[in-house]
Amino acid sequence: MKTIQLVLAASLVLAVPAFCQQHGGSRPSGGAPHNSIPARGPAPVKATPHPVEPNRNYSDQPGHPNVPHVDGKTWVGHDTGKDDPRYHIDHPFAHGQFTGGFGRGHVWRLGGGGPGRFWFNGWYWDVAAADIAFCDGWLWDSDQIVIYPDPDHPGWYLAYNVRLGTYVHVEYLGM
């Protein structure tokens, strides 16, 4: 009888730490695995820029979202060039430049807010007015994003949503 009690006690002692560990939930559907996060942002537009259209269709293939997104190495929708008036800022980097790190090695979890003002890790941002509709499905208190410099629009960065595979133009507001 003592042997059974000893085995049960030992099993309990060994099992308790396993139950105390936090288990991550399953990846939300539509999420991109970490290795599909783009290694770098888009290249500057060198070809004839795509004209700005009020109701542009970004769904380049069946099943792709109708918002700017990344398909492999292609930044679908980042093709309007440097003269796109929607992304003109009179005083680029008025709040300083973001120095927290760019690309797949720097994944940030959103801490709250919304398109008008959101934050992560003590840094504050806002979404470009032209892009607010593109972040409709973002979870502002939990989604992971990656920041990239925008090579065509001074003062703007691109925030890539890891879960959705989509991106929007964002402005750094400082700490």
Description of each model-found segment:
Residues M1-Y87:
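Extracytoplasmic low-complexity, disordered linker/stalk tracts in cell-surface/secreted proteins
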Residues N55-M175:
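Low-complexity segments
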